Amino acid sequence: IQSPLWHEQRYKSAFHKSYNEFPKNSLLEGVLIPEKLKKGKVKLRISYNQFEKKIEGSKYTSKEIKTLQIIESNSINYSLKYKDRKNLDQLFLKRNSCDDIIILKNGLVTDSSYGNLVFFKNEIGYTPEEPLLKGTRRAKLLHEKKLAEQFSKQLGTEICDEWQNRNHSKLLEISKLIKEMK
């Protein structure tokens, strides 16, 4: 299990925020990976409420992201990781022919539909100060100082605005964007 400490911290925080008490057991207590899922990457989903936990596992397949559509939503709230992703899914449907989306909230870059964003400028990684969800990998990289401690709320917005002004489009082509940022 990748980043167990960070998953545990997010679990405790979310549990407390939802139920006004801390959980009595560890998130990962009782997690057993079936033999058939012990090879390769596995996506582990742990759903819980105040009284019980449900653990599901499936093979993980990553998807290659080549294009991103910029979508604005000032009303979206995903501060806790929910099984119900209806609001994110509705935004994702607006991607046209793109592979994924970049979500702007109140004019600021937040996340993609699937995870946190990192922008590199002069070989320094920046992540939005106010993501929709503070992901576990993001927390780990910030703690390890692999991302800049100084957040730039505007960095992502500047990159997106610059791209849109030059290309007259809200479509970001990742390969071109990466070449131009170097």
What positions do the PLM features span?
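Helix-start/capping segments and mature chain N-termini
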Residues: 1-43, 47-182
